Amino acid sequence: MASGTKSDIRSLNGLSYPPLDGSLFFPEIIEYNAQHNSNRPYFVYPSDEGSSELRQITYLEFYRACQRVAHAVRPGRQGKNREVVAILANCDTILYHALFMGTIYAGLVPILMSPRNSAPAVVNMLKKTNCHHMIVSLHSLGELVSGITAELSQSSDLYHLQVDDLPHLATIYPYLSSETATSPFVPFPKAEQSPAKNDIMFYLHSSGSTGFPKPIPITYLTGNHYCLMRALGL
């Protein structure tokens, strides 16, 4: 194919590419795509077992799902900004991604924890990140949660931990694979101030092969750098 400018590429595939000059952070890029590439697929999955038909979740539907998560985890934007929230869940991929991004839209800082971690390992990461709120899939991880609360109760210091069950798929995707711009939707209130580039956007953690897993902070600037990678570009 003949070489062309970026505008040529846009005209060929009908996409509107978000700017990657740092003017938009990762959450804003998803919002941009919801506005300018609203009907493009974000997820594609089989409609039913044994069926060859594919269904899709568009950028618009995914963005709105994230906004519904924000309403669920922080109603009315109450409480403090930038509090750390642990996500410890076994759930569908489309729900997990919405839970992750929705927590960020809510002005909070998620730490993504593997459910394979032991209770002492989770408690160690909670304390290292000063995290007092966990969103978990209680139906499948109830035993681990019980171990975490028991571990905290044996601690010398009183450590408060709020544990909430993750929102249901039907709550976050009420029009699964069929949401349109005219579907009822209430956007989450926007923050009065945008985050700084060196603010922590979320935490990952190390494997823990040589001890307890260590929290790894990912800043908004690092998130932008991920978007510039060809293999991960949005």
Placement of each model-derived feature along the sequence:
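AMP-binding/adenylate-forming domain of the ANL superfamily
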Residues: 16-44, 64, 69-71
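Conserved AMP-binding/adenylate-forming
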Residues: 52-59, 70-117
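Flexible, low-complexity linker/hinge segments
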Residues: 15-24, 169-200, 213
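AMP-dependent adenylate-forming
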Residues: 6-8, 29-58, 75-76, 87, ...
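Conserved AMP-binding A3 loop
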Residues: 56-60, 192-194, 201-228
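Structural core segment of the AMP-binding/adenylate-forming
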Residues: 105-187
